[in-house]
Amino acid sequence: MLTRRNFLLKAGLATPLLFGGYAFGVEPRRLLATQYRPAPRQWKGGPTLRIAVLADIHAINPWMTPAHIEQIAHTTNALNPDIVLLAGDYEAGMGRFGVGSFVPMSECARALSILRAPLGVHAVLGNHDIGWHDGDNVRRAFKAHGIHVMENAALRLEKDGRPFWLLGLGDGNYGLDDLPGTLAKVGDTAPVILLAHEPDIFVDVPDHVALTVCGHTHGGQVVLPGVGVIHVPSRYGNRFAYGHIVEGDRHLVVSGGLGMTGLPVRFGVPPEIVMITLGADVTPTV
């Protein structure tokens, strides 16, 4: 006979197994499209723009395989972005510790080369990329497959006759970012989008930047009911952990990312493609 005590005991024993099974085998394979519609005043005069953001791919077998990256790329294309931003961390640190096996960066880049957008695919590097062969693996592979890598660079783009600037920073974790120097490359008053890997840079972003886009945090990667985020790799705790963040007149979007680091688990933060819509016809989310 199953008594209440036995039921609670068995449920207590089963819960960690169910949690572990879901966090290891189910949530990492999910894929969401998360929509944001910020309305920064600094975008006044800018075009209506659909931005797809892919962050923290961390390519590694058997979880983030080239075939899975291809699936992500095809799903992104189906969302019809005007521009695709890759927010860093294509390499997977877990492979150094015998967890999974490395995916050659040439295969990751080949899978990402499926991405299509009228205004191009633009990437910054993350701390895992710099920490593994100083980023040269990613630079070479992305160049070979036509993916534009930006390191303290500025690019003037135009849609529907309306210009804007895209800035891409070097990795801040390794001190390779030059925000003042990159901002100085902006040559006119067209609105500015800043792409960086780590969101900690946001404390230094000036008011005239319309939107900052980052990854790095994985949204905490594990968010427990009743507990919240376990850990965010940031000097500012949970301040820039995830989502659309508005401070004063400044807007930041932090992607929860796609892959995993440390352990091959996700819980409460499913992998996501972020879609950001900017423009005069947008109904703001904040």
Segment roles from a protein language model:
Residues M1-F19:
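N-terminal secretory signal peptides and thylakoid transit peptides that target proteins
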Residues G20-Q35:
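Aromatic-capped interface at the extracytoplasmic side
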Residues T34-A39, V103, E107-D178, T182-V186:
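Extended active-site neighborhood of metal-dependent phosphoesterases/phosphodiesterases
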Residues P40-I51, L155-L166, V246-H251:
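Beta-strand-turn-beta hairpins that frame and shape the catalytic cleft
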Residues T48-R140:
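Membrane-embedded segments
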Residues L54-A55, V84-D89, V121-N127, M150-N152, ...:
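Active-site neighborhood of phospho(di)ester-bond hydrolases with catalytic His/Asp-centered motifs
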Residues Y174-D188, L195-T212:
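Active-site-proximal loop/helix segments of hydrolase catalytic cores
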Residues P199-M275, V282-T283:
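Conserved beta-sheet core of the metallophosphoesterase superfamily
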